[in-house]
Amino acid sequence: MAPIRRLALVAVAAAVGVGFGPAAEAAVQTLVFKSGPVTVTPYDAITRTALIDSPAVDGYVTGIKADLVDGSGNVVPNTQVMLHHVVFAKIGAPDYTCPGTRAQRFFAEGEEHYAMSLPKGYGYPNKGSDHWGLLAMLMNHLPGTHTVWVRYTVTYATGEPLSPVKPIWLDMNNCKADPIYDVPGTGAAGSTSARKVDLTMPESGRLLTAGGHMHGGGIKLVLSDRTCGRTLFTSQPSWNGPIPLPLLHEPGPTKMSSFQSPLGIPVAAGDDLRLTAVYDNSRPHTRVMGIMIAYLAPTLVAGCEPVPGLTIDLGTPGPPTNIAVPLLQKPSGPLRKNIKGTWVGDYTYGAQRVSVKRGTRFTWRFTGTFPHDVTLVTGPVGFSSPWTTSGGTFSHTFTRPGTYKLFCSLHPARMTEVIQVRKK
């Protein structure tokens, strides 16, 4: 077998000297891998987990990015089949912020197309015997079934020890396969909703680079060091770019600002780091995320050392777009009044047109073989259920009158429901 498992080697750069101390030569390779084929039916979303190929010799990942390609290797744009998000993990290795999970998350990318690139002299250690896996969510905006592949390009250094980095995953809803939450959207114009997650640093080091991930309605991700009383980095969304049609979800940022620093942001053992996700709260935003992945080079840090200048890939940040997502299929069937719930089968809701009184606690009973959910598209208050299969239930109490338009986020063109909540 070749030194790299079943990969397409697209370029081998000239050997370069990196690291600290006496100059040495390291072979830096640009390697291209592909996942297995993923088939997505029209106007549906799909999630997949898979073991994937990785470098089969010991070395260091110094950069990585991902996209979707067709069978000929052509890039598939977001307006056709969207790489909504993809997470790469090293199977069997403990995760930094979710140590009970034996899958170390070391890179992720979404609609914002973040590409990780470490400063010279640093790398994410990888053994030839390590195994990689991915979790991907794709959305097909086309009327036909399409098969695509996740292509990931890895910059890989061998032949010399680099200073190792550790990936730190900060997440508003950590340690879940689908770490979403909902912004209710019940505030006045200009109001915001903030959610926070804290991490007490178990070791000292320097943060060399970081990128963020948000969904529609996102305003900013703020990484701060509460021990030192300072903001370390703010990742801001950009919204300029083509909007995939038809809309299968609220459009997310086309870019999130990221930073890189060869000196690194100093953090000391015991420091309380906080990531704050800020969303618009003037209208509902469902199934949102607030995630940042940062790369730490462990080293001694004495207290609250000065933060160096950062090289920031800013983009063109601005306020989130206000785009109403329509129901792609009109709910049908008789109007069901004052019922307390309904069933959810494969690709349909039992009662699609419902009228209930304010204060009703409504329960969806899942009976399908495949995962489905209940997600608000537009309405007075944002809410959603987890992906659920047969035997599961989800309940919501309607406290505000109005029209609630719902769909299954995995099958938005096939599964729709409208619930009218009356005052009396």
Q: What does each model-identified segment do?
A:
Residues 324-424:
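Extracytoplasmic copper-binding redox domains, predominantly the cupredoxin/blue-copper superfamily
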Residues 210-211, 365:
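Short, conserved beta-strand edge motifs with alternating hydrophobic and charged residues
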Residues 2-3, 218-222, 416-418:
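Short amphipathic alpha-helical segments with coiled-coil-like heptad repeat character
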Residues 2-26:
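Secretory targeting and sorting signals
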